[in-house]
Amino acid sequence: MERILDWNKYLDTAAKMVSEGIVMLKNENNALPLDADKEVAVFGRIQFHYYKSGTGSGGMVNVTKVVNILDGLIDNGIKVNEKLLDTYRKWDKENPFDLGEGWGGEPWSQKEMPLDEGLVKETAKSCETAIVIIGRTAGEEQDNRLEAGSYLLSDDEIAMLTVVRENFKKVVLLLNVGNIIDMTVINRIAPDSVLYVWQGGMTGGKGTADVLTGKVSPSGKLPDTIAYKASDYPSDANFGREKNRDIYAEDIYVGYRYFETFAKEKVLYPFGFGLSYTEFEIKTEKTEITEGAVKLSVSVKNIGSYKGKEVIEVYCEAPQGRLGKAARVLCGLEKTRELVPQEEQVVEIAVDIAKLASYDDSGVTGNKSCYVLEAGEYKFYVGSDVRSAEYACSFEQGEDLVTERLTQSLAPVESFERIKPVCEGGAFSIGREAVPVSEVDESARRLEKLPKEIAYTGDKGIKLWDVKNGKNTMDEFIAQLSDYDLSCIIRGEGMGSPRVTAGTASAFGGVSENLNGFGIPAGCCSDGPSGMRLDCGTKAFSLPNGTMIASSFNKKLTSELFTFMGLEMAANKVDCLLGPGMNIHRHPLNGRNFEYFSEDPFLTGKMAAAELKGMAGAGVTGTIKHFCANNRETNRHFIDSVVSERALREIYLKGFEIAVKEGGASSVMTTYGRVNGLWTAGNFDLNTVILREEWGFKGFTMTDWWANINVRGKEPDKTDLAAMARAQNDVYMVCPDGEKNDDNTLAALENGGIERCELQRNAANICGFLLHTNALKRAEGIGNTVKVINREDEEQEDDKPVQFYKVDRDITLDLSDVETKKGTSYSFALDLSNFGIYRVIVTASSTQSELAQIPMTLFSMGTAVGTFTFNGTGGKAVSMEKETPMFSRFTTFRIYFAQNGLDLHSIRFELTDKER
């Protein structure tokens, strides 16, 4: 079967997502939309260097072209002041964009051109409107900081914005950022219009220009509360204050849940806020309360003069009861179609009453470890943001109702105090209560839940596709696997495994010859949430970031966009995209917020489910990550998130739960760090009790790349795959070779550290996932291709003379002078005297962190030999090797560098005695 991926439609859908995700906070003095007949002045070097995404694995998408905001304006017919533009171009050439030092070392912002006031005044004479663009980035292993040029504006940016404000009649400020930044100085300078244009991927400039010119009216809404100061956020007192631990004392009161309950006066822009060029009238026309749902019919009428879309948000105010609740909690959302002036649409929203229950982790209601709908009045509010939403209806719950009985899981092992509301005179103040600690014997729980062992049969000729086709059962198939096979299948191979698409993150499943012989294919994983990361240099589509997607509040459009993403994955033989990222925006300084959706778990879960449904339409899927409470990048591989069980279940796990139950998630990645003292990679309660037993998850789980694993009370160890497998975390990502590794699996089988039945369970999970992949279809010989149409040919590198080196049996090339800057390539050729299998040894060093991922891919005659992914080496030379056949006298090689930060020393070729 051949399917079609229309690249033009892909581009258009992504640009539409950008235009719907932009959040306009302010628009005075008729600053926007722009007048097509008037010239504008554009300030800020980011006009040439649009940030398409943040940094790290979530942003390393190789693209042919990024449409920046300047391009978008010009393409939309806006005349840009040429003299100012030429001045910026000249300065930008003389002051190159600073790429930084590679993985986790990119600067948050760039140096800005000092503005000559005479030039500004002269430009203002011919331009009524000035557009100022400020950019920011952050990402993996790089949190934002409360300093100038990161969360705060730099002195250069303040000076630029000030002089422009003093001289121009209208000033439009565009924030090309991954997450919210400080607005204090911006408010003081008072531009007429302020828009968060986020990071919109490769079509970001087009979607942004569509909004600026009025082609599209902005309809994005804030997925986070913007407070006056960073210190106003309830997590601030416990974010990054300790090297190895963050205590979540704010508990369930994250973001607007805190501000609307305790501190409304600290909010500059409320959650869900966003302006349009038009105005809407929102009325709750009808409500119906049944035994299981609250149904609301809401009319939305465009009463302005521009066409546009509006978002309807439903919030619930639950009774305080004995547990304590947030003043308002998002429980429903829908987005209208585009409405022309005077057009009206009735939106239907149903709220599942059971989902309004709160988790009792202390037993104060008499129902410990249960979700409880406490007695009292449940009020519902409808509107376009949390603050302005108006009362719609209510119902009275006569008595406490248990909606779900569970068991204590993931509770903290150390006591601390958390926030709890105290009501005095109709207002809430902050009280404190002790957090319940764990009473669970984790080892005993694991032994109680051991599966039944399947008797070993040896090879019976059963292939995995026989299970798919109903010829044999999964148990019959798994019975064939030896202890050695079971030890191999829990290893992911990578990065850049030759078993799968070149330059991808890992292969899993069929990572040995024996496993391949059973018809187990090698599944393929590729980073990340913003598009496919192909470290061999292959170009892919860069998507808008997670925060922008959440800001759209458009589930339908999200699914449409990710159906295209899924087709692109299928075309590249990728089975799992390592995303969506689903962690909560607990604090605005988290560097990876750009990958994630929101401070709200309901919005997070709904948007993730929409992405997964879209990819499923193309026969592929995403891997929801990082499971769970990955809310800080600094020291992320050792950080302990100390959280109450209630906050975990209601906030930090809830989005994942929605993605599993509503989005059909079938692949999950755990974190680098700990939750309540135990590394998530080996956490039985997380990976088995909650994920599988409570939520009904049927897929497979994986660790993050080179993650630590531990047993309670013991030091972490990257080789303790037995602890990982016992927890029912199925695959360790990653090992250099799936057939041989220094892990402890086989030794643990011998000494009772793990049971064979547990490894069989892991294997069944992995194979059960592979049953539904395109990888298995290919292994079975079933055609399943994707034809890409309307995609322009990728730009080819300029032809450069290639030096040839004569080789008898071995050669070492000194590459210490080769430029290794991100995106560059180096080519050379060998003149061989002897043909055969050659060992390729690459030696390099890096001063980056030990978890930095610095890939370089070697191509032989246009085909990838493999990707050599170095970690930080502390400046010491490290060698990596692969093998490749060479049976042509003249063999040309190309090295592609996908990231900064690598110091290349040499490459050596050695003829082996292996036969072809």
Give the positions of each predicted feature.
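Glycoside hydrolase catalytic-domain context in secreted enzymes
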Residues: 1-388, 408-850, 854-916
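Short beta-strand elements
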Residues: 388-407
